């Protein structure tokens, strides 16, 4: 679920931090810049793990701050495909079941990846597994807040870097706002034995 990613960045330390240990200042600046940010095709940055190398620091004319090239390793949330995770149901919609891990919310289990047969209850706004028994179908509701075990089957990165509007977009910008896309999305599946709500598979 978590991986260590080697990175290199130039860190600017302002003069009023010179009295502190350099590593402490760099640690703070890197976490301020990267923590809780999604890096394209890398994952969600969590926190600094360690600093592996510090190159020479430079002070440029007109800027009293020091600039240091830093080699470091960062803890990144990037689960591998087919990994099994446990989260909580954040909500349900016709698009599927939305799951949260607490620190990461952009997880979707689409209808075709639910335990089948499944239906969406419009009145309750929840997905229901119509579990077949000898006594007939038994509805198992996927309620908000329930813990769910799922398999990661796909991921999607979207480059959300700001870009200048095109002429066509500029003309329509006053009419409608573009839909905000999540920079990193996971697609899950619970369509196999043992997956789904933990309460479904609790041994009696």
Curated annotation (Swiss-Prot):
Keyword annotations from UniProtKB, A to Z: Antiviral defense, DNA-directed RNA polymerase, Immunity, Innate immunity, Nucleus, Transcription
Glycoprotein listed as a keyword: no
Gene Ontology biological process terms in this record: defense response to virus; innate immune response; transcription initiation at RNA polymerase III promoter
Gene Ontology, cellular component aspect: RNA polymerase III complex
Keyword Kinase: no
Function: DNA-dependent RNA polymerase catalyzes the transcription of DNA into RNA using the four ribonucleoside triphosphates as substrates. Specific peripheric component of RNA polymerase III (Pol III) which synthesizes small non-coding RNAs including 5S rRNA, snRNAs, tRNAs and miRNAs from at least 500 distinct genomic loci. With CRCP/RPC9 forms a mobile stalk that protrudes from Pol III core and functions primarily in transcription initiation. Pol III plays a key role in sensing and limiting infection by intracellular bacteria and DNA viruses.
Subunit composition and interactions: Component of the RNA polymerase III complex consisting of 17 subunits: a ten-subunit horseshoe-shaped catalytic core composed of POLR3A/RPC1, POLR3B/RPC2, POLR1C/RPAC1, POLR1D/RPAC2, POLR3K/RPC10, POLR2E/RPABC1, POLR2F/RPABC2, POLR2H/RPABC3, POLR2K/RPABC4 and POLR2L/RPABC5; a mobile stalk composed of two subunits POLR3H/RPC8 and CRCP/RPC9, protruding from the core and functioning primarily in transcription initiation; and additional subunits homologous to general transcription factors of the RNA polymerase II machinery, POLR3C/RPC3-POLR3F/RPC6-POLR3G/RPC7 heterotrimer required for transcription initiation and POLR3D/RPC4-POLR3E/RPC5 heterodimer involved in both transcription initiation and termination.
Protein name per Swiss-Prot or TrEMBL: DNA-directed RNA polymerase III subunit RPC8
């Amino acid at each position: 679920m978590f991986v260590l990613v080697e990175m290199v960045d130039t860190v600017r330390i302002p003069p009023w931090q010179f009295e502190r240990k350099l590593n402490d200042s760099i640690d703070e600046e890197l976490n301020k810049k990267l923590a809780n940010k999604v890096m394209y095709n890398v994952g969600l940055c969590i926190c600094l793990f360690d600093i592996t190398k510090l190159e020479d620091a430079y002070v440029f004319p007109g800027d009293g701050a020091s600039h240091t090239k830093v080699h470091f390793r960062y803890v990144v949330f990037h689960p591998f495909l087919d990994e099994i995770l446990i989260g909580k149901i954040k909500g349900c919609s016709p698009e599927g079941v939305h799951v949260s891990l607490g620190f990461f919310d952009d997880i979707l289990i689409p209808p075709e990846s639910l335990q089948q047969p499944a239906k969406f209850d419009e009145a309750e706004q929840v997905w229901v597994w119509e579990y077949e028994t000898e006594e007939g179908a038994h509805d198992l509701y996927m309620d908000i807040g329930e813990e769910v075990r799922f398999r990661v089957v796909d991921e999607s990165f979207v480059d959300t870097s700001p870009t200048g509007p095109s002429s066509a977009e500029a003309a329509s910008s006053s009419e409608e706002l573009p839909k905000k896309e999540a920079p990193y999305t996971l697609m899950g599946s619970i369509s196999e034995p043992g997956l789904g709500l933990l309460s479904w598979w609790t041994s009696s």
